[in-house]
Amino acid sequence: MVENVIWPAYFDAALSRRDGRRVPMELAVEEPSIDEIATAVQQVGYDAVVERDVAYPRRHWDAAGRVLVKDADDAKNTLVQAVAAYVGALRD
């Protein structure tokens, strides 16, 4: 079973690529929540499991949580880009 981990830092417009952002600034949002990300993952068509009390290793002081994506067929980068597009659409 393939399990991808998606951290809110991947979509945070306040972070640089060096600090963990994985999407272009055009797709990034301010302070993404794991609930928004989980909703976007479900919109893309995958099952999402939210873990709230874990911290992204590069930001170990900020336990923002993470979203686990079960059985994703796509490459992780493709999945992250699709989720970023939906998170942006949810904000509009």
From Swiss-Prot:
Chief location of this protein within or outside the cell: cytoplasm
GO cellular component labels: signal recognition particle
Keyword terms: Cytoplasm, Ribonucleoprotein, RNA-binding, Signal recognition particle
Source superkingdom: Archaea
Subcellular locations according to the entry: Cytoplasm
Gene Ontology biological process: SRP-dependent cotranslational protein targeting to membrane, signal sequence recognition
Subunit structure: Part of the signal recognition particle protein translocation system, which is composed of SRP and FtsY. Archaeal SRP consists of a 7S RNA molecule of 300 nucleotides and two protein subunits: SRP54 and SRP19.
Annotated protein name in UniProt: Signal recognition particle 19 kDa protein
Record organism: Halobacterium salinarum (strain ATCC 700922 / JCM 11081 / NRC-1)
